[in-house]
Amino acid sequence: MKRTTTILIAICVSALFANGKQISQNAALSAARKYSRTGQVAPAKNLRSDKTNNAPYYAFNLEQGYVIVSGDDEMTELVGYAENGFFDAENVPPQMQLWLDGYAEYVAAVQSGKAKARKILLSDSPSVVVEPLVTTKWNQDAPFNNFAPEYTDDNNNTQRCATGCAATAMAQIMKFHNWPEQGVGHYSYEHQSFGTISSNFSEHVYDWTNMIDRYNNGEYSNVQADAVALLMKDCGVSLNMNYGPVSGASIYSYTPAFKNYFRYSSRTVNRSGCETAEFTRIITDELQEGRPIIYCGTGEDGGHAFVVDGYDTNYFLHVNWGWGGYSDGYFDMNYMDPAGLGIGGGSGAFKWNQGIVLARPLKDGVEPYEFIQQLCFVLFNDVQGGIFCKQEMPTNKGDDVTILLRNTANLSGESFFGSLNVGVFDDSGALVTMGNEERLENNNGELLEFQSGRLYSVDLPMTLNTAGIADGNYIVRAMSKANGNVWRKFASTDCLNMTVADGKVSLVSPTPNISLTGIGSYNGNVYKGNPFSVNITIHNGSSI
């Protein structure tokens, strides 16, 4: 029977949950030597003292390049490495810092029991499967931002806005393909600080020949500067760039920009919308086809984007951070597997949500990417999305059952026009029956545009008739169908367990629908490793 009462309980909380084991800097140094050709390693410059004894990761500079190793022995030992350059903790590209912050939070989540540790045995001397494809080492400052809006800084000096990492990543992809010869169309938008920002792409012919790999001070001409600055401006405008000292754009702006203004086929894949193995396969397949991709993450300070253009036998991805070549190297992008989250982890357990953008020039004879629906459930306003049964269970076989889809998001990278439903699947995964199709439409019966990156924060009711379902155990999943397409399961694996027996039907959510509605206070000291008690109020909204 479903318990609907709100209950008051006392919970004994430990001040420390230790699943992993912190390793010392000396132990990390020994690990780093395994990945050095000469065995000569040194702690990275400017590592603060508070990060050297209880660190989530350790960075060591080599004679050439650097290595980053995990600070926890339950994790994969190697985190990332570079064959050139050095690591300076005080001069880390923001995109890389986001990734490192995410890793640090992942280690903390593992050590507190909120996430599963991921440990894979690696080769000490990995070989490259796909060599880095992109040769440009571009940045966000001059001359790249020469055509960006101007602003006045705190010292009353006129400065140019940064191009934005999103534009720099996009521009490097386009330079790799040297495409298109000329843009398409016109676009403008209103910016709260700079007014109307616009570009007439159709008037712009891109001077690919005069875009060089490196723009070192005093080593490029005005023509070369203008060539790259125009490309950067057009990329920024097409992405609806929020210009400023630090500029940013949404991952969901990429695919429309590539398609509408630059004659590319493009597809956006959100990591939350597919299994890690599939996500990795999409990346490696694209790289093996000789096409670099854009990798995006969203953190507390906004979105970041960078280029992934190769990988090694450990499946570490080669990253071009878009910071003038600084810190480019091979990194483990699989450490934040969403499947490793524990109960309560949800989609907000780590600092960034991840996705990739694929792009290929839409030339004659080139097949465009297939549109793949990526509808899924997300955490919104501290409410976890999912699929829930509205009524009391069990019910009589033959009755209609109302099933709610909560916090449904479109992560497809393109607008969705179509219908939602629920499907009943047997133990073999075969579709047995479906509910009533619910078209997303307006009052005139026209399909609504479910824009990319948006969500329905209201519960969407689906109706399932249980007549004709044979006795047995089933799984009920949310389904979507783009207009003129086929039914597909939601990318989220959320489901209901259905049991049909003796004329009764029972639907149970395997995902707890429990919310914290109140928490008491604790008067006293809390010591590491010692338990303490506090009263909290929770509400069980689950089917059981």
Where are these regions (language model features)?
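Short, non-transmembrane alpha-helical segments in secretory-pathway proteins
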Residues: 19-49
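Active-site-adjacent substructure of cysteine-protease-like catalytic cores
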Residues: 45-63, 256, 260-320, 328
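Catalytic Cys-His active-site segments of thiol-dependent hydrolases/isopeptidases
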Residues: 70-85, 313-335
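Active-site-adjacent structural segments surrounding the nucleophilic cysteine of cysteine proteases
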Residues: 78-247
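Extended low-complexity, serine/threonine- and proline-enriched intrinsically disordered segments
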Residues: 413-441, 544
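Aromatic sugar-binding surface patches on proteins
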Residues: 441-463
